[in-house]
From Swiss-Prot:
GO terms for cellular component: cytosol. AMP binds at residues 170, 196-201, 205, 266, 290. It comes from Methanoregula boonei (strain DSM 21154 / JCM 14090 / 6A8). One of its GO terms (biological process) is AMP catabolic process. Signal peptide: none annotated. This is AMP phosphorylase. Keywords: Glycosyltransferase, Transferase. Belongs to the thymidine/pyrimidine-nucleoside phosphorylase family. Type 2 subfamily.
């Protein structure tokens, strides 16, 4: 059946709005699938039906803007609509829901349908939930990783080694890629770093780099830039590298699901797809991180290493201290300013510098650039000499930014509120989750100037009335919201040496 097209400004990738009488004539209900065919060019996609009795008249079809990207229809043109077959991937998802193991072919079918929008958001959520309740074993993780790579773009460099680095997240202020990438590239190695934007954090690496330069490039452009200057820091979502991963992450977000198997596949698929054969994984360990204990960290590290071996990649993991933020800044502009200051020669903050050179040093040792045990010093020498700054400026320039940018050019939001210590004592705890929440309330990462600047960290003796941290915001209402809601978060806890006094029974 043919219908007149009306383009709806809805970004959903796979959807169509039909009058309920037209849907009945086609033989479909709400949530069913139809095949949409553009008669001009024979392009066809599958879309999920939503019915209406008022928003669409009979004979017209409301095609979502996201769906039309693959059909190239214009308003008023005709479209052919047919009932679509039920995808086989739904049977495989049901198999996983029932506790079964997925084969290589079944996993590939599911991921192909994810990429081609053959399954709905609800069905993808069912797959994610099934994999969370019935965890993937290592063979299934390998199948998932390879399927993610196979259904997207890949980069193949003419020579090796190709280095990459990833942090599993959970720690605010973890801006180390802004140092690690230029240090490694300045050593003569190649590091095509594709990064994520923040979903639950105050600033992903891509959000930070976007303060300085464009981060949206194709896979081919990433390869060309890496060949020219040795490294990139780009947003992976623009490259079509492992595209299924981005869609899975979006469905995980509302439930805060972070299934172990899918996390392993997510990280390693992107590294494999950019051609990396040497990978360093940062696993922050701490009470308010994704990995609460060293034992859990070692277990996760072994899983990354095993998956790497299955893929022909050498992986080393660093268990890093995650109970406090990295450095003193949280939020895009604040973190970028802190990173530039270190690249320009600042010798603080030590936590930021030490973590960055340690991870860069592992990569240098893995590649053979440095002997075992000397990598961190080599990384420190590259940083101290100014070679890392020079390389970072080259990366900024090739990505379309200003290579002459200085730390003082990067400013926080104009609205600020200082939080002072309520009593004298030691800072005994810094709650990473609360700090991230507070920075997001202030507007980060969308508002680049929003965030938190810490004035003291865990273990510091502080007097009543001295500043603990400053909240920055670009909009006054955002600052007020952060201050009001932040009163219940207690992101920094100060206690005296005397915790309590227990009197004798005679004094009770």
């Amino acid at each position: 059946m043919k219908y007149s097209v009306r383009i709806l400004d809805i970004a959903t990738r796979s959807g169509i709005l039909l009058n309920y009488l037209d849907a009945r004539n086609i033989g479909v209900l709400d949530g069913d699938r139809v095949q949409l065919i553009n008669p001009k060019n024979s392009l066809a996609v599958t879309a999920v039906v939503t019915t209406t009795s008022t928003l669409e008249g009979q004979g017209t079809a409301g095609v979502y803007r996201g769906t039309n990207r693959r059909l190239n229809l214009t308003e008023g043109e005709e479209i052919e609509i047919r009932e679509a077959d039920r995808p086989a991937s739904l049977d495989f998802i049901k198999k996983k829901m029932d506790g079964g193991r997925l084969t290589k072919e079944e996993t590939l079918t599911i991921i192909k349908d994810v990429v081609n929008d053959e399954i709905s958001a609800a069905e993808l959520t069912a797959f994610i939930t099934a994999s969370y309740i019935n965890p993937l074993d290592m063979e299934e993780v390998e199948h998932l990783t390879r399927a993610m790579v196979e259904t997207g773009e890949r980069i193949k460099f003419a020579s090796r080694p190709i280095v990459d680095k990833h942090s599993i997240g959970g720690v605010p202020g973890n801006k180390i890629s802004l140092l690690v990438v230029p240090i490694i590239a300045a050593s003569g190695l190649k590091i095509p770093k594709t990064s994520s934007r923040a979903i639950t954090g105050a600033g992903g690496t891509a959000d930070l780099m976007e303060v300085l330069a464009n981060v949206e490039f194709s896979a081919r452009e990433v390869q060309e830039m890496t060949e020219k200057v040795g490294g990139t820091i780009v947003w992976g979502g623009a490259t079509n590298i492992a595209p299924a991963d981005d869609r899975i992450i979006l469905q995980e977000y509302p439930f805060k699901i972070d299934a172990r198997g899918q996390m392993l596949a997510s990280v390693m698929a992107k590294k494999y797809a950019v051609g990396a054969n040497l990978v360093v994984i940062d696993i922050p360990v701490g009470s308010h991180t994704k990995v609460p204990t060293v034992q859990e960290g070692r277990k996760l590290a072994r899983e990354f290493i095993e998956l790497g071996e299955r893929l022909g990649m050498k992986v080393e993991c660093a268990l890093t201290y995650g109970d406090i933020p990295v450095g003193y800044s949280i939020g895009p502009n604040l973190e970028v300013r802190e990173a530039l200051r270190v690249l320009e020669g600042a010798t603080e903050p030590n936590s930021f510098i030490q973590k960055s050179v340690s991870l860069a040093g592992i990569a240098l040792e893995m590649s053979g650039k440095a002997a075992r045990g000397t990598g961190a010093q080599m990384a420190q020498d590259i940083l101290s000499s100014g070679k890392a700054l020079e390389k970072f400026r080259q990366i900024i320039e090739i990505q379309g930014g200003d290579p002459k940018v200085k730390s003082e050019d990067i400013l926080p939001g104009e609205h600020q509120f200082v939080v002072n210590a309520p009593a004298s004592g030691y800072i005994v705890e810094m709650n990473n989750v609360s700090l991230i929440t507070l920075a997001r309330l202030a507007g980060a990462p969308h508002d680049r100037g929003a965030g938190i600047l810490l004035h003291a960290k865990k273990g510091t003796l502080i007097k009543a009335g001295e500043p603990l941290f400053t909240i920055y915001a670009e909009r006054e209402w955002r600052l007020q919201k952060a201050v009001e809601e932040g009163r219940h978060l207690v992101p920094v806890l100060v206690e005296g040496m005397l915790l309590d006094r227990v009197p004798s029974q005679s004094e009770v």
